């Protein structure tokens, strides 16, 4: 069975914010960890958008449409952590979000997202765009 990452801990007052979706969530994107930003209309988009990447999104249900409100997480914990490509997080490794929405261990042109603990948990602390 494939790992299904979830937000394990989050403080809604300081660890996330809400925004409407700019586009429908694709079925292929369900149960994957994505890096999100906002477009020039303030709607949530996969990738950097107009704002630069702001947080992490994991959707678990099909049928979410443009305009639906979602949570974008900026701080908290994800468990079990897997990259957007489905690779399990490596303990002690830093992970980065990219302009295309993917999250991996490549720092080049990426925003710091967090690091992984010994039990495979991502400690989420998204870097604020400059």
Describe each region flagged by the PLM.
Residues 1-130:
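Surface-exposed, low-hydrophobicity beta-strand/loop segments enriched in small/polar/acidic residues
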């Amino acid at each position: 069975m494939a790992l299904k990452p979830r937000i394990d801990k989050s403080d809604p007052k300081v660890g996330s914010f809400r925004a409407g979706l700019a586009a429908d969530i694709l079925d292929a994107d369900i149960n994957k960890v994505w890096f999100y930003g906002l477009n020039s209309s303030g709607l949530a988009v996969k990738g950097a958008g107009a704002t630069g990447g702001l947080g992490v999104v994991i959707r678990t249900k099909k049928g979410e449409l443009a305009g639906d409100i979602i949570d974008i997480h900026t701080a908290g914990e994800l468990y079990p952590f897997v990259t957007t490509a489905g690779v399990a997080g490596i303990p002690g490794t830093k992970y980065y979000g990219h302009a295309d929405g993917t999250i991996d261990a490549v720092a080049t042109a990426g925003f710091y997202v967090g690091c992984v603990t010994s039990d495979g948990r991502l400690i989420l602390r998204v870097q604020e765009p400059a």
